[in-house]
Swiss-Prot record:
Residues 125-141 have a biased composition (Basic residues). Residues 105-124 have a biased composition (Basic and acidic residues). Residues 1-64 are annotated as: 13 X 5 AA approximate tandem repeats of Y-G-Y-[DE]-K. Keywords: Repeat. Sequence repeats lie at residues 1-5, 6-10, 11-15, 16-20, 21-25, 26-30, 31-34, 35-39, 40-44, 45-49, 50-54, 55-59, 60-64. Residues 105-149 are annotated as: Disordered. This is Putative eggshell protein. It comes from the Eukaryota.
Amino acid sequence: YGYDKYGYDKYGYDKYGYDKYGYDKYGYEKGYDKYGYDKYGYEKYGYDKYGNEKYGYDKYGDDKHGHGKDYEKYGYTKEYSKNYKDYYKKYDKYDYGSRYEKYSYRKDHDKHDHDEHDHHDDHHDHRHHHHEHDHHHHHEHDHKNGKGY
């Protein structure tokens, strides 16, 4: 079959196509594709192509929403440190109105702003977007720009 007594062919590859160092002829390691990811999409350090490991955190300890590992446990994000009550944790996606009221950092926002936020948050698409996407960014957006819409 062309394999020597160690199981390697004349090019130095075993029957699975890997050499003694565990690389195939394209230079990829056993179990990893040419981009360095395994069948589950993680590379050898445990991060997927988005830079997240199997628990959903990247090398900086943030998940895809930008929340650190402490977020789950303590309800704090790295960005806002432990001095702030977490802005989203206690509320589900249908509770934006009271969330905004109770936890607004913009103490000076007027009634008009507040009503606009409530009204806007009732819109299904917006609510979905707000819930699913980057809370950190949205949070800043709301507050930096006042109405923000």
